[in-house]
């Protein structure tokens, strides 16, 4: 299945010069959504994952069904003020701005093998921040999974020490 047939490209969104890859058509098609999830699950099974972590918000969309299929838990990584218990946080840069991510302090146990799932690999800043949070809690990042990779932004180079799958490249 060619998943690119289920991604809409929106020029100059969210700002001038950016091409936004809209995955909602993929999410709207049950077979495409299932196929994408199954490809990530196949990758994860080779890496003996204990828990799945996904950054807000689209990391939830693919991370949750992957964790369900693997029979492991899911840990949300959120923006400040969105998690109710004690958190750790990390600041990072986006393709078009900056932000902070937070993780509950008790969400990852030392030594747990973690799969980080997100919709998009651009500069790698969001996932790098997520990795820092996971490793600060003693988790071991066993793999990274992305629906889309924006090759020209070279995020893979920042993350090349981790096993990785991307389902589409632009």
UniProtKB/Swiss-Prot annotation:
Q: Which GO terms describe its cellular component?
A: cytoplasm
Please give a single GO biological process term from the UniProt record: AMP salvage
Q: Where in the cell is it found?
A: Cytoplasm
The reply to whether Phosphoprotein figures as a keyword in the UniProt entry is: no
- Name any one GO molecular function: adenine binding
Instruction: Give the EC number.
Output: 2.4.2.7
Q: Identify the keywords attached in UniProt to this record, alphabetized.
A: Cytoplasm, Glycosyltransferase, Purine salvage, Transferase
Top-level taxonomic group: Bacteria
Q: Which family does it belong to?
A: Belongs to the purine/pyrimidine phosphoribosyltransferase family.
Q: Which NCBIfam families does UniProt cross-reference here? A: apt, PRK02304.1-2, PRK02304.1-3, PRK02304.1-5
HAMAP family for the chain: Aden_phosphoribosyltr (MF_00004)
As for what it does, the entry says: Catalyzes a salvage reaction resulting in the formation of AMP, that is energically less costly than de novo synthesis.
- Tell me the protein's name: Adenine phosphoribosyltransferase
Q: Which organism is it from?
A: Fusobacterium nucleatum subsp. nucleatum (strain ATCC 25586 / DSM 15643 / BCRC 10681 / CIP 101130 / JCM 8532 / KCTC 2640 / LMG 13131 / VPI 4355)
- As recorded in Swiss-Prot or TrEMBL, the protein's gene is named apt
């Amino acid at each position: 299945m060619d998943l690119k047939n289920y991604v809409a490209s929106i020029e100059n969104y969210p700002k001038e010069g950016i091409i936004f890859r809209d995955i909602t058509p993929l999410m709207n098609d049950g077979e495409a959504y299932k196929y994408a999830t199954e490809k990530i699950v196949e990758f994860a099974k080779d890496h003996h994952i204990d828990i799945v972590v996904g950054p807000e918000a689209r990391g939830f969309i693919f991370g949750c069904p992957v964790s369900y299929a693997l029979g492991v838990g899911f840990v949300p990584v959120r923006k400040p003020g969105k998690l109710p218990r004690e958190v750790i946080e990390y600041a990072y840069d986006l393709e078009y701005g900056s932000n902070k991510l937070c993780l509950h302090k008790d969400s990852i146990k030392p030594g747990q093998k973690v799969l980080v799932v997100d919709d998009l690999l651009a500069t790698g800043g969001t996932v790098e921040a997520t990795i820092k949070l996971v490793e600060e809690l003693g988790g071991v990042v066993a793999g990274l999974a992305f629906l889309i990779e924006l090759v020209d932004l070279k995020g893979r180079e920042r993350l090349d020490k981790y096993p990785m799958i991307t389902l589409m490249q632009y």
